[in-house]
């Protein structure tokens, strides 16, 4: 049988470990991920985002629990294949960046998309930023469509639905005694990791929204 047919069967049967053995889609590898690390590129990004009505976001932090997490950066996207990572741990101060992006994030007319966006909402709230309108959450959509499975993580959904094996978090921070903080990870690595999250979330949103 052809690879696409085998892939489709594995996806339908939720054979995630077998999906990893198949060759990746060439189309899925085409991407444009940008690091926003200076005032000029930040202002250009905000101009672009302010024209939109829906934006995908993803926060990168130092902890899985939002109340213990320190915000490291924020990913933005408006269409699959394109994403931006705004670093809060680069050349610009965290205070300057948050002051610049706060009006966009608190815009009532803006609908935000995310995966488990409740986490991002809490993390941003810790920085005195309140998202006003949640448009779509891919983890909730997946749960509504498949309530009898526990496989709703972004990694699992990306592999099952997109045939895409995401960058594992362990490749950035390690694990066990050798684990490091996200604050110590090189910006280019976090950029690729976060932008991939945004990209996959947008692709999953397109699929899940049509199925609901």
How should each PLM-predicted stretch be described?
Residues 65, 69-212:
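Active-site-proximal helix-loop-helix substrate-binding element of RNase H-like nuclease domains
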Residues 1-2, 149:
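Short acidic alpha-helix initiation/capping motifs at coil-to-helix transition points
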């Amino acid at each position: 049988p052809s690879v696409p047919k085998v892939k489709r069967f594995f996806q339908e049967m939720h054979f995630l470990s077998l999906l990893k053995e198949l060759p990746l889609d060439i189309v899925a590898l085409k991407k444009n991920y940008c690091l926003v690390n200076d005032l000029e590129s930040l202002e250009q990004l905000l101009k672009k985002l302010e024209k939109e009505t829906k934006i995908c976001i993803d926060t990168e932090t130092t902890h899985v629990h939002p109340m213990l997490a320190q915000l490291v950066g924020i990913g933005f996207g408006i269409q699959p294949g394109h994403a931006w990572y705004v670093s809060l741990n680069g050349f610009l101060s965290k205070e300057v960046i948050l002051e610049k992006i706060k009006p966009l994030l608190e815009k009532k007319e803006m609908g935000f998309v995310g995966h488990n966006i409740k986490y991002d909402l809490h993390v941003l709230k810790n920085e005195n930023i309140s998202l006003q309108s949640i448009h779509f959450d891919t983890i909730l959509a997946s749960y509504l469509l498949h309530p009898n499975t526990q496989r709703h993580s972004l990694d699992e959904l990306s592999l099952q639905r997109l045939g895409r094996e995401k960058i594992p978090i362990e490749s950035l921070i390690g694990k066990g005694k050798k684990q490091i903080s996200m604050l110590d990870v090189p910006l280019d690595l976090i950029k690729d990791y976060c932008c991939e999250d945004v990209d996959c979330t947008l692709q999953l949103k397109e699929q899940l929204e049509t199925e609901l």
